[in-house]
Amino acid sequence: MLPGVDEVLVWEAPWEGFSPPDVEDADVAGLIRRVREGAYDTALILTSFHQSPLPAALLLRMAHVGRIGADSRDHPGRLLDVRHRRLPGRHEAEAALDTAAALGFVPEPRDDGRLRVLPPPDTVGLTGNGPYVVVHPGASAPARAWSPYRCAEAVAALADAGHRVVVTGGPAETGLTREVAGPVARDLGGRTDSRSLAGVLRSADVVVSGNTGPAHLAAAVGTPVVSLFSPVVPADRWAPYGVSTIVLGDQQAACAGSRARYCPQPGHPCLDDVTPTDVVLAVQKLLKEST
């Protein structure tokens, strides 16, 4: 989906993710061998603000990558050739661009730094004709998701306000999307892959989503976002980048900055105190700004 990408090598790192794999000698050795066979000149390691690049840097060094750069709070020893230190308060996208620039990869003068994807397919066969608003209710971390009943109420409120609504979700979320869509919205749960989802999001007037991948994919295809943003990570670093965005949710809630996967507060107040009316008004505001 990304222009300029020639090959994708996927490896599950044992220091990342919600359920990282065990450390296996053969698995680590296999990665080092595959990278060494690629004879790569340079490696840019991109991590979020609370992650260390040094485990990856060690493996890349062992794979004989010529030059390695990353943003690192920790002293890298001989693991990094370029150690960048991010400026305080930078959005994650900007921090990544800064790190790339420190390694010599500077955007072209006309490049605004926004994520780009290859043109997605036409998806009118999925969405039907006419304008619509997308509601994406799921998230990999439950703390970042609006409760299903709230999503369903918002879908009904959007429909009552005259909007056609399309609900999206992955194959494991079909029960959720069916509940949220109800009888008033088009349910695309489990019916899109990443490319067709990009097409659905690109053609939407507005996307309503928590802090999860489709919100950032919507930004990549230029669609405004109503971001139901749990403050477990800071919105100024992680909100959708480069498009008109309205952030809803109590950013000063007790869970702020906790990085919690599950909400530590009874009733999930940071998000569930957001009302369907709040969402409708936010959608209408973004629509007004875009006309």
Residue ranges and their predicted role:
Residues 1-291:
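Catalytic machinery of carbohydrate-active enzymes
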